[in-house]
């Protein structure tokens, strides 16, 4: 039955079912409160008053939709399959003397006996006292036909054809164990039981309807039409979930366990001694039977509500519209017949108890659909049902919402996988995600004389659900991470549906994208076809509390599967293998099912899992002595350890449980007594991270993390699986800066875990550095500043390279000359411990704290013992700046000791990865950092290839003094004048290629003039053309833009600070004098623009002897503002062409259409040309102007300017330079550049520039002011070409083309 009582606190867990001997659901409300009858949900207010009707309707709709999501998917078809049952053992007896019921009750079955020994139940004992309370007087009926009809109705709900499979005619028995040890809401373990037939196994025992007036056999089969299905869905969410009003119960005697909040109405057969085991229901109690009033709370037992129906009985099907017949009275009490209670009833009861507390708090319900097994679960769907205040009118009704949900369920990937399973696809069976039914020693087997393997149920998908409270998070990044999806989930929000006048319900589903290639496989594959069975301890056959060998998930739900690891395996003698400790699977399942964990904690747990996996990979490469010590420390932990799956090893389970759930407890290994790690092993003084009283090195066991290894010949305490050794703690202690991990029994707080996750610190290992490296470190520390050591972290060498800052290209090392701490090169000490020790000894010294972001930096620096430091405030004496360069042989430092690794690197093979340039700037180190004479020429040769744009072009001043480069005010002013020189300011000194020289100003860096001239010419030549990878059909891609465009920002979105944008525009447009008129100055980029606008597009095409492909090229527009001008200024559009240009016929027409950012045509230019006489390797240009010509009354017709757009004469009427008056009439202008190749191919090259005047609106306004409908002028086209010479030779030689 469905429990209907809801209190303010979650109900205590217990063991009991509804059926022949016990009826769950007759319960009292807490503290004398009223009760709203919903399907498993009653909202009780604090004062005990009944909720409003809207709340009742909301709860009914939520549970109705939840039942549709949970039970409407055709994945549990094997519940209705025909099963061949062997010969029944002699223990199968019937007891029906009390109420005339002839239900089989296997009193000697293992399942019935072992239920009483459930350690999770609060009741023990071997007797069940069932009392005939309601006097069942139902007449016997054909149970097989009724069960087949109910099965058919449920198949209709799940859209399964009954003819597609063999329907079972056997009722089912289900035992439900509730675990309340570690959960507030309890957890449920459902194990399926099949009733035994009588001898022969063909017919079923006729049984009477256990409920009062249960006329299930008299109802006729329902219709299978779509309208009836739709009507049933509407009824499911509205009316069928409400029960009738509570009436006074009939006089009955009820057995009430001591710790249960529910009353158990005895409805079973005889009152004699026996098992009330009917329909998956059992009321087990070791206490004498008491009356209902004996333990009634606040005298409310007399107002107990009637048991409600579930999705398994005939009355439910009638209300859904799937069964026709007269509706029984709402006032009568309905109790399902125990013979027909199947798995669906009890599973739905468990689901309702899951949702009970969530709905009582008015919280959203989240239903997660997983693909098992639990150890390798994969989140497939996440359904969220929440109520909210009424929103604007909805676009979907409740029946439509139910239909949409059914469509979503039916066309999901789970159904597709089920089809593969029905087709016996071998890839599905080999995936490890299929539940098989074995012949013997399973949880579903009963204690018969023998069992048969024939007629077993078909395998099915390991699909299980989890119902929890939905918690909303503020983080928008990594959705598939924060919700448990392995990939970015597809989100579908159904329209809101109003359930009352002021309240609506919202349903959304997040699903994993479709997985191609069938079922995802479990790696590694499980060795046995039963991936969820528990391993027997010591080889002895273990028995679970519900009978059988290992727990086996026989339902598509995850309730049985998730709690299988929660049941401790017991031997025949009753002793527990793991000494009473819960299994590791329980800890992991608690983590998985704990809804109180916040998003941040879940992210931290995932991070810790990744750290553990990475460390286990490293442990395979550990030294032999470390391997021996770890093997000795982990050997005693393998005994008696139960695993959640056979593919998951004990060490993995232990490490996960140790890291994620339980506080750190360290089992010290020593030859004598155990000592706590909170005290030093050498002197016994109390310490946190490092003993502050010891000053010695401590030998090899001093450790790089300040923890003592101790001797490794002892044994760990095998009584605690969560203990770890000191050597193992040494591997993990560097993951956090706090010392709480090393204190015995101290749990981590959230702030500490968050700090660790932010830092992303890899674990330090106790590496044994090379003696030569240590000597080099000691020599370097001794030579630098006369024995001064500014960075204690230099003492630990890095042998494996930087593991975190892989993308770091700049390292700033700030050191303070006030700290004096000599170090011993032979001692490998932890940097933090040394700093802590130094802080204790010198409290008056400014402490330099390291971020520990890069504990081992090799690829970030040529000096392998340097570490990143956070710059302390006010420290600018010694600044080290690194820049990424394309050279691998750049000198590392301007000091003698840095030349040693450089010379070794130059003698050997060159490194493939780029090195870094280190500029040591400090006035107090000039003497020691002067380069020796022998290395100065090498440095000078390498300097021209170094990209110093960050130094020279940086907007922020660098107030440092460098021995290699002088940054005094005179030099800075000279460098500024050189940067703003007219001859080189057009081409910025930035280049992406590593093959050509980068600095056009190489002459100022002691480079020969010839080399500088060649470099500057190559730079101009490269920056003028685009890449060779251009494609004429798609010129808008970034890879086809030139280096100059990418770095100057011409073709990039206008972003960045206004100061940087202004400086870039000044470098491109400023510095050159103006030309004859405004048109030339704008076209030749001699004026400084006011603003730069992106998004313009030019459609370029041509026609003639052939028609080239029309292309779309992005354009950049520059707007100007001239002071003192009353009229608006034209704006310039510039379009960069590809390197090879745009090939056109020798004679024809070029059509260019300019589009603004919103896609509207600004102007279409049609330029005719004829260049058939143009020789190869020559160039020319065409400029077309479009002007507004005003017609005067006395103007002679013969002196009008030609208006034909086909004017191709080289002698323009306007000339090359137009006057100021003509400039006022200029509306559009386009400038095209033509050139021919060595083979005579004609093409447009370099760029196209357009001038667009914005006076069209002014012309229209002037026309309307004069009362004229049309504009008082016409547009006149004027085309111009050079006259003498018409074509000019190209500057490049023929060999370069």
UniProtKB/Swiss-Prot annotation:
It is found in: Nucleus. The lineage of its organism: Eukaryota, Metazoa, Ecdysozoa, Arthropoda, Hexapoda. Keywords: Nucleus. GO terms for cellular component: nucleus. It comes from the Eukaryota. Residues 1074-1132 are annotated as: Required for macropage invasion. Pfam families: Chromosome_seg (PF13889), DUF4210 (PF13915). Disulfide bonds: none annotated. The protein contains 2 transactivation domains (TAD). Each of these domains may be required for transcriptional activation of a subset of target genes. Expressed in macrophages. Residues 717-731 have a biased composition (Acidic residues). Residues 605-620 have a biased composition (Basic residues). Belongs to the ATOS family. Its main location: nucleus. Residues 1150-1158 are annotated as: Transactivation domain 2 (TAD2). InterPro entries: Atos-like_C, Atos-like_cons_dom, ATOS_Transcription_Regulators. Transcription regulator that synchronizes transcriptional and translational programs to promote macrophage invasion of tissues. Required in macrophages for their early invasion into the extended germband. Induces transcriptional expression of metabolic enzymes as well as of the translational regulator pths/DDX47. With pths/DDX47, adjusts transcription and translation of a subset of OXPHOS genes to increase mitochondrial bioenergetics and allow macrophage tissue invasion. This is Protein Atossa. Residues 174-182 are annotated as: Transactivation domain 1 (TAD1). Residues 133-144, 213-226, 287-305, 643-655, 706-716, 1203-1212 have a biased composition (Low complexity). Residues 1-22, 117-149, 206-227, 287-311, 518-655, 704-741, 1017-1048, 1192-1213 are annotated as: Disordered. Residues 564-578 have a biased composition (Polar residues). The keyword Coiled coil does not apply.
